[in-house]
Structure formats: structure tokens, C-alpha cells
A protein has these predicted regions:
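DNA major-groove recognition helix of helix-turn-helix/homeodomain DNA-binding modules
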Residues: 56-71
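Short alpha-helical DNA-recognition segment
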Residues: 25-45
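A short, Lys/Arg-rich alpha-helix, primarily the initiator
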Residues: 1-23
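The alpha-helix within a helix-turn-helix
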Residues: 21, 32-33, 62
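Residues within the helices of the helix-turn-helix
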Residues: 18, 29, 59
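DNA major-groove recognition helix of helix-turn-helix
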Residues: 46-47, 57, 76
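Short, charged recognition helix plus adjacent turn
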Residues: 1-7, 63, 73-79
């Protein structure tokens, strides 16, 4: 049986997060504050594709940017 497997594109997801943050006129510090993160470094790590937000942060990012959680992520389908 053939099926498609979805793989998270961390770099493209990070670029999407950066675009959303900039479009919302938020600094790294602003967004870190809204998410109650200890350091804005986490935002830099997400935007560079080094790390991805956990489920709780994805949920809160979706609320901040007024969109669905799954729309924050960039997925690549492979066979």
C-alpha cells in the first residue's frame, strides 16, 4: 500500500513564523513576552529552523496570529 508521509520543513516553518511576526510588527522580545518565554533566543531558534515550537507554544502562536495551528507548519509530502 502506497501512502504519503508528511515531513516538517523546519527552515520554511521558521521563515513563516518570522514573516508572521514581522507582519504583526512584533519584535523577538515582544513575541517572547506574549508567550511568557524566559528569553527571546527561543524565537531566534524557531525562525532559523534550529528548533520547532512545542505543542503549547504552537497553540499560543496560532492564537496570537489568528490562524490554525496546522497553518503555522510547512510540511513536505514524500512517498
Amino acid at each position: 500500500m502506497d501512502y504519503q508521509k508528511a515531513i516538517l520543513d523546519k527552515v520554511s516553518t521558521g521563515l513563516r513564523l518570522r514573516m508572521l511576526r514581522c507582519k504583526s510588527a512584533l519584535t523577538h522580545e515582544d513575541l517572547a513576552g506574549l508567550l511568557q518565554l524566559k528569553s527571546p533566543r527561543v524565537i531566534y531558534d524557531w525562525e532559523s529552523g534550529m528548533k520547532i515550537p512545542n505543542a503549547e507554544n504552537l497553540y499560543n502562536l496560532a492564537l496570537i496570529f489568528n490562524m490554525k495551528m496546522e497553518d503555522l507548519l510547512v510540511m513536505i509530502c514524500s512517498f
